[in-house]
C-alpha cells in the first residue's frame, strides 16, 4: 500500500483527507450543537410551523431527545451522502488513476464533505443528498419530475431557506436530465410548472404563516419537556429564531456585514484554489454538442448563483452559503457531464505541477466554517 501511495500521490491526498475528516468529527462532537439540537425538539405540536419536519419525525420514535442524537443522525446522514457521492462519481467518471485528481478536488474540497462534517447536524446536507439521488435515478418519465418536486417539498419543510439553497440546483438537474435529455411536451412542461408553483407556495406559507402561534415562554417549556436532560437550558438559547421575522433577520445580516465582509477575500482565495476543477467544468460546457444546451447551462449557473446572493443578503452564515454554492456547482458539473458532447473533455491532469500544489493545499484545508472562514 505504501508503494502505491508513493507511486500516486493523489492516493496519499485521499488518505490525508480521510484523516482530516476524522479530526474534524472528533472536534465537532465536543461542541454544543445549539440550533441542530433544537431542530430535533421542534415539531408540529402547536400547528404548522417552519423548521419542524425533522423534529416531528424524531417525535414518532422517542418522547425524550438525547443530545447524542444530533451527532448520530448527522453522522448517519453524512455517511449516506458520502456513499451516494462515491456512487455518483463512479457512474460519471469511474475510479481510475486518471480520475483521482478530479475526485480529490471535489470530494476532498473544504467546501464539501469536510465542511459538512464541521456543520454536522445542520440541514444543508439533506439538500445535497437528495440532489445526488436525482443524479442517480432514471430521469425519463414524469415520475422523475414528481420525485424532484417531493424532494423539494421535504427540503422546504426541513427549512424554508432550501428554496434558495438547493431547490434551484434540483431544478437545474431536472431540466438537464429530463427536459434537455428527453425533450419537452405540453404534458411534462405543465407538470413541471405546477410542481414549481406548489413548492413556491409552500415556501411562502412556511415563511409568512409558519411562525410559532404561542408565546416564547410556552414554546421553550415545550422544548424542555422533550429534552432528555432538561437542565441543559443553555442549548435552548437560540429558540428565539422561531419568532424572528424576516425583516429582523435581514437587519441583523446587514448590521454584521462590515465585519463579515472581511471573509470575502478568503472565500475568493478558496474558490481560486479550485481553478483546475473550474477550468475542467468550463471546458465541459464548451464541449457540449448543442448551443442551446450550453446557453441553458450557463443561465442555470447564473440563476443558482443569484439565489445564493439573495441568501447572503438575508442570513449571515456566509461560510456555509459559499460552501453549499460550491457543492451545487460540483453537482451541476455531474449533470452537465451527462449531456451529449461534441468532443471528449480531458480530465484534470495529474502531471501539472501547479495542479498538484493546488490539490495539496485544498486537501490540507480542514473546513470553511459556518459564519466566518474557518
Predicted regions mapped to residue ranges:
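Membrane-water interface signatures at transmembrane helix termini and the short loops
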Residues: 112-123, 267-340
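Transmembrane-helix motifs of polytopic, lipid-linked glycan transferases
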Residues: 75-98, 133
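Membrane-interface transmembrane helices that cradle and orient dolichyl/undecaprenyl
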Residues: 130-145, 179-181
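Membrane-lumen/periplasm interface segments of specific transmembrane helices
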Residues: 22-30, 188-280
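Short hydrophobic/aromatic helix or loop-helix immediately within or flanking a transmembrane segment
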Residues: 45-76
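Perimembrane helix-loop-helix junctions
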Residues: 166-196
